[in-house]
């Protein structure tokens, strides 16, 4: 193969540098900002040692996980207090009881239009209860998670970053659905109980697409999640940890709290703060009332 002359190589380098500079200029100064009409409200619901997040958009509702079976009464009362009747998308990140324990009650008490799952093989009673509830409510559109799939509730976009069906292993935590929610210029990330191995895969595949304003910390603030390489890619300024008071796992782990403090990331904890509500106006995310 004929080698390129130094002059040609220099021209190529100059072209690449100019292209990169123009791309940066467009992204940061010339591109029209994405504007939205209204706000979305993010409810990190205190379901004890479990997870449940409700996002209310002007055009509909997204629910991610449904806490434990023992907290389902509280979850339903919370949804009722907000006047929730319809859930447009219901994402079950993975079939552990602390994430899907109240899912069957949600399916039986509200109009759920779409449910997103991974079909990770599970023999738990909570998972069986979800399947039974779906059999009774055949009108619900069941969606199997596919990496890169995008769904919308009005101007709010939900992007699934995995896993693909062929990537489900034997670990439910690391088969968690990863969801990025985008509203205007703002974005939020929800990773279920995904741990380091999944975070590394996300950075490898989506490094330039992971930047978010808000992150629900993975695995209840466990040190098995929120790796440095992942946090470097996501760079959130606001986070929430969903965990139970005096839980037996020691969540959130001290290493995680130290990491958040060193990075100057604002964080809230359901075990201490109870239900935590955030607002996203399409430009920034902030705790309601602040």
Which functions belong to the PLM regions below?
Residues 2-290:
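Non-globular, low-confidence helical/coil segments that flank catalytic cores
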């Amino acid at each position: 193969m004929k080698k390129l002359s130094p002059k040609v190589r220099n021209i190529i380098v100059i072209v690449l540098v100019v292209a990169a500079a123009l791309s940066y200029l467009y992204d940061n100064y010339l591109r029209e900002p994405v504007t939205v009409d209204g706000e979305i409200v993010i409810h990190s619901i205190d379901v004890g040692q479990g997870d449940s997040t409700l996002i209310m958009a002007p055009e509909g509702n997204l629910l991610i996980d449904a806490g434990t079976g023992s907290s389902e009464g509280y979850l339903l009362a919370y949804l009722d207090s907000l006047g929730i009747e319809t859930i447009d998308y219901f994402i079950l990140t993975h079939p552990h009881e602390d994430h899907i324990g109240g899912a069957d009650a949600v399916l039986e008490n509200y109009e759920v239009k779409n449910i997103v799952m991974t079909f990770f093989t599970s023999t738990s009673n909570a998972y069986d209860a979800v399947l039974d509830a779906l059999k009774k409510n055949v009108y619900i559109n069941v969606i199997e998670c596919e990496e890169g799939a995008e769904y919308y509730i009005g101007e709010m976009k939900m992007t699934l970053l995995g896993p693909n069906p062929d990537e489900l292993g034997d670990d439910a935590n690391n088969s968690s659905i990863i969801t990025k929610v985008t509203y205007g210029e703002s974005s939020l990330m929800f990773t279920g109980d995904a741990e380091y191995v999944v975070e590394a895969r996300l950075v490898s595949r989506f490094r330039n697409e992971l930047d978010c304003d808000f992150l629900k910390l993975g695995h209840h603030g466990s040190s098995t999640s929120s790796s440095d390489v992942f946090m470097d890619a996501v760079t959130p300024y606001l986070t929430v940890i969903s965990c139970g008071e005096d839980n037996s796992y020691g969540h959130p782990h001290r290493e995680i709290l130290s990491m958040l403090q060193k990075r100057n990331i604002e964080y809230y904890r359901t075990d201490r703060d109870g239900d935590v509500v955030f607002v996203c106006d399409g430009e920034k995310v902030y705790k309601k009332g602040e």
